[in-house]
């Protein structure tokens, strides 16, 4: 059996109020790092410490395809630890933010990737997370939704929230992040101010 080490000694610390872009080639270990921080993948070596529960939002996040968007909102909120009373209070604002119209009552399997992204983001940020991790999820939304999502992320960062983001969209990264980490084959090649890391990454690709 071949053992593949997706991430190799990639140690770093992220502080409140920081917004970090993790960039690198496909298969470099970016998504693996986010999944490990979220507790979705076991860590075979080293430790992960977080002051708050990290919330991961990705295009492959678990939603139930056979039930309605509305039902998925309730299930997603329960998974985030909300009470039924909290869900009832937030339900209208989540539906309004997702802005998918009557589709909220249709089975999720009928949704486009953009509609799923809208619903996921609305659920994930309904209670402002202190640590939000985004794995390419904003890239599938339309321009209007991305602008609305970025505005909510900026609000979160302004209140000392923390963002870790995987994206190949450099314009999006520049708008949202102030620090960059370049990862290749599970190894950190650069870590520092965003513009400097983007420059190093672009030249080294």
Predicted stretch roles:
Residues 16-21, 25-79:
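ABC ATPase nucleotide-binding domain signature region
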Residues 176-193, 201:
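H-loop (His-switch) and adjacent beta-strand-loop-beta switch element
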Residues 125-134:
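A short, proline-enriched helix->beta-strand linker immediately N-terminal to the Walker B motif
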Residues 167-168:
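H-loop/switch region of ABC-family ATPase nucleotide-binding domains
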Residues 74, 86-103, 122:
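Conserved ABC ATPase "signature" region
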Residues 107-111:
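Conserved ABC ATPase signature
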Residues 146-159:
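Helical segment within the ABC ATPase nucleotide-binding domain
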